[in-house]
Amino acid sequence: MSRGLGDVYKRQTVYFGGGTPSVLGADRLCDILDFIKFNFNIQNNAEITVEVNPDSAKTIDFEKMYACGFNRISMGMQTAVEDELRLLGRIHSIDDAKTSVERAKSAGFNNISLDLMMGIPNQTIESLEKSISFCADCKVTHISSYILKIEENTPFYKVQNKLKLADDDMQAEMYLKAVEMLDSLGYKQYEISNFAKQGYESRHNTNYWRCGEYIGIGPSAHSFFEGKRFFYSRSMDDFNNNKLSFEGTGGDEEEFIMLSLRLKSGLNYYEFEEKFGYTLPSYIIKKAKEYEKYGYTNVTDKSISFTPKGFLVSNSIISELI
Protein backbone atom coordinates (compact mmCIF):
# COMPACT_ATOMS: atom_id res chain seq x y z
CA MET A 1 0.00 0.00 0.00
CA SER A 2 2.77 2.45 0.89
CA ARG A 3 4.51 1.74 -2.43
CA GLY A 4 1.37 2.73 -4.30
CA LEU A 5 0.47 5.83 -2.32
CA GLY A 6 3.57 7.02 -0.53
CA ASP A 7 5.03 9.46 -3.04
CA VAL A 8 1.81 10.71 -4.63
CA TYR A 9 -0.53 11.88 -1.88
CA LYS A 10 0.53 14.27 0.84
CA ARG A 11 -0.99 13.21 4.17
CA GLN A 12 -2.26 15.98 6.44
CA THR A 13 -2.98 13.84 9.52
CA VAL A 14 -1.88 10.59 11.14
CA TYR A 15 -4.01 8.95 13.84
CA PHE A 16 -3.02 6.03 16.09
CA GLY A 17 -6.27 4.64 17.46
CA GLY A 18 -8.48 1.59 17.28
CA GLY A 19 -8.04 0.60 20.90
CA THR A 20 -5.23 1.50 23.25
CA PRO A 21 -2.07 2.00 21.15
CA SER A 22 -0.27 3.50 24.15
CA VAL A 23 0.19 -0.02 25.59
CA LEU A 24 2.87 -0.50 22.91
CA GLY A 25 5.08 2.01 24.68
CA ALA A 26 6.93 4.99 23.25
CA ASP A 27 9.73 3.05 21.53
CA ARG A 28 7.43 0.90 19.40
CA LEU A 29 5.05 3.77 18.66
CA CYS A 30 7.95 5.90 17.46
CA ASP A 31 9.26 3.04 15.32
CA ILE A 32 5.87 2.76 13.63
CA LEU A 33 5.64 6.51 13.11
CA ASP A 34 9.15 6.57 11.62
CA PHE A 35 8.09 3.81 9.22
CA ILE A 36 5.02 5.81 8.20
CA LYS A 37 7.06 8.95 7.63
CA PHE A 38 9.56 7.01 5.51
CA ASN A 39 6.95 5.29 3.34
CA PHE A 40 4.27 7.98 3.09
CA ASN A 41 4.41 11.63 2.12
CA ILE A 42 3.51 13.32 5.43
CA GLN A 43 3.33 17.12 5.29
CA ASN A 44 5.51 19.08 7.69
CA ASN A 45 2.68 20.51 9.81
CA ALA A 46 0.64 17.31 9.93
CA GLU A 47 -1.56 16.64 12.95
CA ILE A 48 -0.23 13.39 14.47
CA THR A 49 -2.46 11.98 17.21
CA VAL A 50 -2.13 8.99 19.51
CA GLU A 51 -4.90 7.66 21.73
CA VAL A 52 -3.90 6.87 25.29
CA ASN A 53 -5.73 5.81 28.41
CA PRO A 54 -4.87 7.34 31.77
CA ASP A 55 -3.62 4.04 33.16
CA SER A 56 -1.01 3.23 30.51
CA ALA A 57 -0.15 6.94 30.24
CA LYS A 58 1.17 6.94 33.81
CA THR A 59 4.44 5.41 32.67
CA ILE A 60 4.67 6.14 28.94
CA ASP A 61 7.62 8.25 27.77
CA PHE A 62 5.81 11.36 26.51
CA GLU A 63 9.12 13.16 25.93
CA LYS A 64 10.24 10.52 23.44
CA MET A 65 6.86 10.52 21.71
CA TYR A 66 6.89 14.28 21.32
CA ALA A 67 10.48 14.25 20.06
CA CYS A 68 9.73 11.66 17.37
CA GLY A 69 6.81 13.64 15.95
CA PHE A 70 3.58 13.04 17.84
CA ASN A 71 1.89 16.39 18.55
CA ARG A 72 -1.62 15.56 19.77
CA ILE A 73 -2.91 13.33 22.59
CA SER A 74 -6.45 11.94 22.81
CA MET A 75 -7.14 10.52 26.27
CA GLY A 76 -10.13 8.31 27.13
CA MET A 77 -10.93 9.68 30.56
CA GLN A 78 -14.76 9.17 30.38
CA THR A 79 -15.61 10.82 33.72
CA ALA A 80 -14.04 12.64 36.66
CA VAL A 81 -16.21 10.81 39.20
CA GLU A 82 -14.62 7.74 40.79
CA ASP A 83 -17.89 5.81 41.28
CA GLU A 84 -18.76 6.30 37.61
CA LEU A 85 -15.33 5.07 36.55
CA ARG A 86 -15.86 1.87 38.53
CA LEU A 87 -19.28 1.34 36.92
CA LEU A 88 -17.65 1.68 33.50
CA GLY A 89 -15.05 -0.90 34.48
CA ARG A 90 -12.18 1.55 34.08
CA ILE A 91 -9.06 0.82 36.12
CA HIS A 92 -7.61 4.32 36.22
CA SER A 93 -8.34 6.96 38.85
CA ILE A 94 -9.02 10.66 38.49
CA ASP A 95 -5.54 11.34 39.84
CA ASP A 96 -4.14 9.13 37.07
CA ALA A 97 -5.90 11.26 34.46
CA LYS A 98 -4.67 14.52 35.96
CA THR A 99 -1.11 13.22 36.28
CA SER A 100 -1.13 11.95 32.69
CA VAL A 101 -2.28 15.32 31.33
CA GLU A 102 0.39 17.12 33.37
CA ARG A 103 3.10 14.72 32.17
CA ALA A 104 2.07 15.18 28.53
CA LYS A 105 2.13 18.96 28.90
CA SER A 106 5.55 18.89 30.54
CA ALA A 107 6.83 16.90 27.56
CA GLY A 108 5.71 19.64 25.16
CA PHE A 109 2.20 18.57 24.12
CA ASN A 110 -0.10 21.60 23.91
CA ASN A 111 -2.89 19.87 21.97
CA ILE A 112 -4.66 17.43 24.30
CA SER A 113 -8.20 16.06 24.04
CA LEU A 114 -10.22 14.37 26.78
CA ASP A 115 -13.21 12.09 26.20
CA LEU A 116 -16.29 12.37 28.40
CA MET A 117 -19.35 10.15 28.56
CA MET A 118 -22.94 11.13 29.32
CA GLY A 119 -25.74 8.82 30.43
CA ILE A 120 -23.56 6.67 32.70
CA PRO A 121 -25.68 4.71 35.22
CA ASN A 122 -26.49 6.90 38.25
CA GLN A 123 -24.88 9.93 36.62
CA THR A 124 -26.46 13.28 37.47
CA ILE A 125 -26.29 16.76 35.99
CA GLU A 126 -24.12 17.74 38.94
CA SER A 127 -21.63 14.91 38.39
CA LEU A 128 -21.47 15.74 34.67
CA GLU A 129 -20.70 19.34 35.56
CA LYS A 130 -17.93 18.10 37.84
CA SER A 131 -16.36 16.16 34.96
CA ILE A 132 -16.54 19.13 32.60
CA SER A 133 -15.01 21.42 35.24
CA PHE A 134 -12.20 18.90 35.74
CA CYS A 135 -11.38 19.00 32.01
CA ALA A 136 -11.40 22.79 31.98
CA ASP A 137 -9.18 22.91 35.07
CA CYS A 138 -6.71 20.66 33.24
CA LYS A 139 -6.60 23.34 30.52
CA VAL A 140 -6.92 20.86 27.67
CA THR A 141 -7.67 22.20 24.20
CA HIS A 142 -10.34 19.74 23.07
CA ILE A 143 -13.20 17.79 24.68
CA SER A 144 -15.33 15.04 23.12
CA SER A 145 -18.59 14.28 24.90
CA TYR A 146 -20.58 11.20 23.91
CA ILE A 147 -23.88 9.73 25.05
CA LEU A 148 -23.45 6.17 26.36
CA LYS A 149 -24.74 3.51 23.98
CA ILE A 150 -25.52 0.04 25.34
CA GLU A 151 -24.13 -2.39 22.76
CA GLU A 152 -24.77 -6.12 22.55
CA ASN A 153 -22.12 -8.45 23.97
CA THR A 154 -20.95 -5.88 26.51
CA PRO A 155 -21.11 -6.15 30.32
CA PHE A 156 -23.68 -3.32 30.44
CA TYR A 157 -25.94 -5.07 27.92
CA LYS A 158 -26.18 -8.17 30.09
CA VAL A 159 -27.15 -6.27 33.25
CA GLN A 160 -28.88 -3.21 31.80
CA ASN A 161 -32.21 -4.10 33.43
CA LYS A 162 -30.52 -3.83 36.83
CA LEU A 163 -28.94 -0.44 36.13
CA LYS A 164 -30.40 3.00 36.65
CA LEU A 165 -29.86 4.30 33.14
CA ALA A 166 -30.65 7.83 32.00
CA ASP A 167 -33.84 7.97 29.93
CA ASP A 168 -34.07 9.98 26.70
CA ASP A 169 -35.18 13.15 28.48
CA MET A 170 -32.30 12.99 30.95
CA GLN A 171 -29.80 12.30 28.16
CA ALA A 172 -31.13 15.33 26.28
CA GLU A 173 -30.85 17.49 29.39
CA MET A 174 -27.28 16.32 29.96
CA TYR A 175 -26.32 16.98 26.35
CA LEU A 176 -27.73 20.51 26.32
CA LYS A 177 -26.12 21.25 29.68
CA ALA A 178 -22.76 20.03 28.36
CA VAL A 179 -23.05 22.23 25.24
CA GLU A 180 -23.97 25.27 27.34
CA MET A 181 -21.28 24.75 29.97
CA LEU A 182 -18.52 23.95 27.51
CA ASP A 183 -19.36 27.05 25.49
CA SER A 184 -19.16 29.20 28.63
CA LEU A 185 -15.69 27.75 29.28
CA GLY A 186 -14.45 28.60 25.79
CA TYR A 187 -14.93 25.19 24.15
CA LYS A 188 -16.90 25.90 20.99
CA GLN A 189 -18.97 23.12 19.49
CA TYR A 190 -17.87 22.27 15.95
CA GLU A 191 -19.46 18.81 15.60
CA ILE A 192 -22.32 17.01 17.28
CA SER A 193 -20.05 15.54 20.01
CA ASN A 194 -16.88 17.63 19.77
CA PHE A 195 -15.80 20.92 21.31
CA ALA A 196 -12.53 22.81 21.04
CA LYS A 197 -10.65 25.94 21.89
CA GLN A 198 -10.23 28.13 18.82
CA GLY A 199 -7.84 26.55 16.33
CA TYR A 200 -7.75 23.15 18.06
CA GLU A 201 -10.52 21.33 16.20
CA SER A 202 -9.49 17.78 15.25
CA ARG A 203 -8.27 17.97 11.66
CA HIS A 204 -8.30 14.19 11.36
CA ASN A 205 -11.92 13.68 12.35
CA THR A 206 -13.06 16.76 10.42
CA ASN A 207 -11.69 15.07 7.32
CA TYR A 208 -14.08 12.15 7.92
CA TRP A 209 -17.05 14.48 8.26
CA ARG A 210 -16.15 16.29 5.06
CA CYS A 211 -16.06 13.03 3.08
CA GLY A 212 -12.29 13.22 2.79
CA GLU A 213 -10.17 10.23 1.87
CA TYR A 214 -8.25 8.23 4.46
CA ILE A 215 -6.16 5.07 4.58
CA GLY A 216 -6.58 2.66 7.50
CA ILE A 217 -3.74 0.26 8.34
CA GLY A 218 -4.11 -2.71 10.68
CA PRO A 219 -6.69 -5.38 11.58
CA SER A 220 -10.27 -3.99 11.43
CA ALA A 221 -9.02 -0.73 9.86
CA HIS A 222 -11.35 0.91 7.33
CA SER A 223 -10.37 3.09 4.36
CA PHE A 224 -12.01 5.41 1.85
CA PHE A 225 -9.94 6.09 -1.25
CA GLU A 226 -10.77 7.08 -4.84
CA GLY A 227 -14.49 6.64 -4.20
CA LYS A 228 -14.18 3.12 -2.77
CA ARG A 229 -14.55 1.84 0.79
CA PHE A 230 -12.55 -1.19 1.93
CA PHE A 231 -11.29 -2.71 5.16
CA TYR A 232 -9.14 -5.36 6.78
CA SER A 233 -10.85 -8.06 8.83
CA ARG A 234 -9.99 -8.61 12.49
CA SER A 235 -7.61 -11.40 11.46
CA MET A 236 -3.91 -10.62 11.82
CA ASP A 237 -3.19 -13.23 9.14
CA ASP A 238 -5.47 -11.42 6.68
CA PHE A 239 -3.72 -8.15 7.43
CA ASN A 240 -0.24 -9.67 7.05
CA ASN A 241 -1.34 -11.08 3.68
CA ASN A 242 -2.86 -7.72 2.66
CA LYS A 243 -6.28 -9.35 2.26
CA LEU A 244 -8.78 -6.53 1.83
CA SER A 245 -12.57 -6.66 1.75
CA PHE A 246 -14.48 -4.10 -0.30
CA GLU A 247 -17.64 -2.40 0.98
CA GLY A 248 -18.56 -0.60 -2.22
CA THR A 249 -18.50 3.04 -3.16
CA GLY A 250 -18.78 6.12 -0.95
CA GLY A 251 -18.85 9.88 -0.99
CA ASP A 252 -22.15 10.25 -2.83
CA GLU A 253 -24.65 13.07 -2.33
CA GLU A 254 -26.56 11.40 0.51
CA GLU A 255 -23.40 10.63 2.44
CA PHE A 256 -22.07 14.14 1.92
CA ILE A 257 -25.30 15.66 3.24
CA MET A 258 -25.44 13.29 6.23
CA LEU A 259 -21.82 13.87 7.26
CA SER A 260 -21.87 17.63 6.64
CA LEU A 261 -24.86 17.98 8.94
CA ARG A 262 -22.85 16.47 11.80
CA LEU A 263 -20.80 19.66 11.74
CA LYS A 264 -21.92 22.83 13.49
CA SER A 265 -21.19 24.73 10.27
CA GLY A 266 -23.60 22.40 8.51
CA LEU A 267 -24.25 21.74 4.83
CA ASN A 268 -22.84 24.47 2.61
CA TYR A 269 -24.68 24.90 -0.70
CA TYR A 270 -21.60 26.10 -2.59
CA GLU A 271 -19.49 23.16 -1.40
CA PHE A 272 -22.23 20.75 -2.49
CA GLU A 273 -22.34 22.31 -5.97
CA GLU A 274 -18.55 22.32 -6.26
CA LYS A 275 -18.39 18.62 -5.39
CA PHE A 276 -21.30 17.28 -7.43
CA GLY A 277 -21.74 19.79 -10.25
CA TYR A 278 -25.32 20.83 -9.55
CA THR A 279 -27.15 22.91 -6.98
CA LEU A 280 -28.57 21.41 -3.82
CA PRO A 281 -32.20 20.42 -4.55
CA SER A 282 -34.57 23.10 -3.31
CA TYR A 283 -36.86 20.56 -1.63
CA ILE A 284 -34.08 19.74 0.85
CA ILE A 285 -33.75 23.40 1.82
CA LYS A 286 -37.52 23.76 2.03
CA LYS A 287 -37.86 20.67 4.23
CA ALA A 288 -35.05 21.81 6.54
CA LYS A 289 -36.74 25.21 6.80
CA GLU A 290 -39.83 23.56 8.29
CA TYR A 291 -37.85 22.59 11.40
CA GLU A 292 -36.70 26.13 12.16
CA LYS A 293 -39.95 26.89 13.98
CA TYR A 294 -39.16 24.06 16.43
CA GLY A 295 -35.68 25.43 17.09
CA TYR A 296 -33.99 22.46 15.41
CA THR A 297 -32.37 24.01 12.33
CA ASN A 298 -30.79 27.20 11.03
CA VAL A 299 -31.41 27.74 7.32
CA THR A 300 -29.71 30.63 5.52
CA ASP A 301 -28.99 31.53 1.90
CA LYS A 302 -25.65 29.70 2.27
CA SER A 303 -26.18 26.66 4.47
CA ILE A 304 -28.34 24.33 6.56
CA SER A 305 -27.19 23.53 10.08
CA PHE A 306 -28.54 22.04 13.30
CA THR A 307 -28.91 23.80 16.63
CA PRO A 308 -27.75 21.91 19.75
CA LYS A 309 -31.40 20.97 20.32
CA GLY A 310 -31.62 19.84 16.71
CA PHE A 311 -28.58 17.58 17.00
CA LEU A 312 -30.59 15.46 19.46
CA VAL A 313 -33.09 14.57 16.72
CA SER A 314 -30.76 14.96 13.75
CA ASN A 315 -30.90 11.34 12.61
CA SER A 316 -34.66 11.42 12.05
CA ILE A 317 -34.54 14.83 10.34
CA ILE A 318 -31.67 13.81 8.04
CA SER A 319 -33.59 10.69 7.01
CA GLU A 320 -36.39 12.99 5.81
CA LEU A 321 -34.02 15.29 3.95
CA ILE A 322 -32.33 12.52 1.96
Regions found by a protein language model. Give the residues of each.
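Short, amphipathic alpha-helical interaction segments positioned at domain boundaries
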Residues: 309-322
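Glycine-rich anion/phosphate-binding loops
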Residues: 54-60, 126
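Single conserved hydrophobic/aromatic residue that forms the stacking wall/gate
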Residues: 1-9
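Conserved C-terminal portion of the radical SAM core fold
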Residues: 67-77, 95-161, 168-198, 211, ...
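Hydrophobic, secondary-structure "cap" segments at the distal end of domains
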Residues: 206-292, 298
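Nucleotide and nucleotide-moiety/phosphate-recognizing core
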Residues: 6-7, 25-31, 35-45
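Core AdoMet radical
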Residues: 10-23, 42-55, 71-80, 84-96, ...
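Minor-groove-contacting beta-hairpin "wing" of winged helix-turn-helix DNA-binding domains
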Residues: 303-307
